[in-house]
Amino acid sequence: MAKTIVVKQIGSPIRRPADQRATLVGLGLNKMHKTRELEDTPSVRGMIRKIPHLVEIIEERG
């Protein structure tokens, strides 16, 4: 089974640059305090690293 991480949106995309909003959509997050379980890949880690002020890693599984 692949490693996964659980990510929670903690910041609002309002008044943020378009690329940061697009990164949130790419992670599957579109509303405050929603969580998403994602596969732990370098691309997902890079997206999280791009918007650390908007997301929080809740848990790492695997």
UniProtKB/Swiss-Prot annotation:
GO terms for molecular function: structural constituent of ribosome. The keyword Manganese does not apply. Signal peptide: none annotated. GO terms for cellular component: cytosolic large ribosomal subunit. Pfam families: Ribosomal_L30. Keywords: Ribonucleoprotein, Ribosomal protein. InterPro entries: Ribo_uL30_ferredoxin-like_sf (IPR036919), Ribosomal_uL30_bac-type (IPR005996), Ribosomal_uL30_ferredoxin-like (IPR016082). Part of the 50S ribosomal subunit. Belongs to the universal ribosomal protein uL30 family. This is Large ribosomal subunit protein uL30. It comes from Ruegeria pomeroyi (strain ATCC 700808 / DSM 15171 / DSS-3) (Silicibacter pomeroyi). The gene is rpmD.
